[in-house]
Amino acid sequence: SCNTATCVTHRLAGLLSRSGGVVKSNFVPTNVGSQAF
């Protein structure tokens, strides 16, 4: 249901942050968003 890259990225970021927060330190949505999009 979610095909756009931004939507998928935000969904993955939300799942990862809820699941543990370990990846959160290595994956910063704002930096990735500004560079990739």
Swiss-Prot record:
Signal peptide: none annotated. The modification Phenylalanine amide is found at F37. Pfam families: Calc_CGRP_IAPP. Disulfide bonds join C2-C7. It is found in: Secreted. Belongs to the calcitonin family. CGRP1/CALCA is a peptide hormone that induces vasodilation mediated by the CALCRL-RAMP1 receptor complex. Dilates a variety of vessels including the coronary, cerebral and systemic vasculature. Its abundance in the CNS also points toward a neurotransmitter or neuromodulator role. It also elevates platelet cAMP. CGRP1 can also bind and activate CALCR-RAMP1 (AMYR1) receptor complex. This is Calcitonin gene-related peptide 1. It comes from Ovis aries (Sheep).
